[in-house]
From Swiss-Prot:
Homotetramer. Residues 291-542 form the Glutamine amidotransferase type-1 domain. CTP binds at S14, D147, I148, E149, K187, T188, K189, P190, T191, Q192, K223. HAMAP family: PyrG (MF_01227). Belongs to the CTP synthase family. PROSITE patterns: GATASE_TYPE_1. It comes from Pectobacterium carotovorum subsp. carotovorum (strain PC1). Pfam families: CTP_synth_N (PF06418), GATase (PF00117). Residues 1-266 are annotated as: Amidoligase domain. This is CTP synthase. Its EC number is 6.3.4.2. Mg(2+) binds at D72, E140.
Amino acid sequence: MTTNYIFVTGGVVSSLGKGIAAASLAAILEARGLNVTIMKLDPYINVDPGTMSPTQHGEVFVTEDGAETDLDLGHYERFIRTKMSRRNNFTTGRIYSDVLRKERRGDYLGATIQVIPHITNAIKERIIEGGEGHDVVLVEIGGTVGDIESLPFLEAIRQMAVQVGREHTLFMHLTLVPYLAAAGEVKTKPTQHSVKELLSIGIQPDVLICRSDRTVPANERAKIALFCNVPEKAVISLKDIDSIYKIPSLLKSQGLDDYICKRFSLNCPEANLSEWEQVVYEEANPGGEVTIGMVGKYVALPDAYKSVIEALKHGGLKNRLTVNIKLIDSQDVETRGVEVLKDLDAILIPGGFGYRGVEGKIMAANYARENNVPYLGICLGMQVALMEFARNVAGMEGANSTEFVPDCKYPVVALITEWRDENGNVEVRDEASDLGGTMRVGGQQCHLTEGSLVRQMYGEQTIIERHRHRYEVNNMLLKQIEAAGLRVAGLSADRKLVEIVELPDHPWFVACQFHPEFTSTPRDGHPLFAGFVKAAGAYQKRQVK
């Protein structure tokens, strides 16, 4: 099988939506029966995003095989059926780390290690490895053309076009075409200069995606084509749109997939986008709306909870409800009290790290439990629900996590000290262990308790969900908590770790140690989020009565 490569770059400004554009194109190609995957190459020097601040970088998306990756991989999985893995995302830091390790080992036989050829060769090797077994691999280059950090990646893909052959490579460049109200027209000069920048490093774009707040007129697209040396049919207008799920149809309507298939000599049927049309229809025709409060630590940057926000929307699609998400800083709950939680139809507490705002989350869990408000706790959201229940129901005054209070009387959440790595080797960790790459992370099997609410929602006895945490329920104190009425609804494969808890005497109170948001998609949704949004709608109706 010959793999075809589409290299996606961005110019003029950042945040043009390269990831969404790449994922949308991948969705069309997949709908044509092609085996497609997507890669994200990040130019920062961190080895991975695992220890980066969520308020700077956004969420860390966890893959099935346990890689901590860029949030764009979440977009990729929500748009195509192919599951991402650690092969789909790497950084400058990872490349340099690998090359330096080989140099120390003597693999280069004493050669002088340089950006060209050693770094660029390592980049090319990883791209080829990531694309193995696929008809088409889209490779998104992070950053903006002209950034110093991106140069080794751009040089690597330039070389790949020569080595793999232009018949199997295509350069797709996203660029900004701004509208100037004073002139009453769109301006193409920024695009021309962005392409000029690409040409200066030896890359001639084959497709231009013109981002604008409006449709770029045909005469302006013709002008761009002429001055940028690109066929007119390969200059695509991508205007701002009210739903990202309309983008596959928008790109297809301009013949982008036909152009690419012809370029790669791929003989495949027309794309059937009926699934995406159904998603757009459900989104545009809700039967009502609910308001869900998300109580978190990183609400200043909604991208820190990108997958949770999208999963809530997917839950809304499955219930024909618009989900209005109210982001609430957990510290506001501490200072202003539970008044900030009034008028919500449900409460969700997502994952997080560190003690700041934890007491506010505990107050929110308490409010949901005592007022029969539907509650979904994820990761830390489960741990705070457990601490709240232990304190106020099970009689464990001051119950806490050893993450926050190491010497507390009732450590209902504690650090797991023994882990097994992907090779089955036991690793011992403590509070002094490195933060990066030292968590229980990736897909883990979970056995659901017969008769539980989650068993009913999933419709399966055994599930696989993705984790990212260091702390777990302390089994030494579990029996006392269960005796007070909390039900363990899911256990790990070895039956040693608590994965899900729920309250049988509450209309809908579920908390899980894993991150269900990472496996939710607009086409399929997710059982927990669908059930949670449904419960929010039921709560709203009860309040009206």
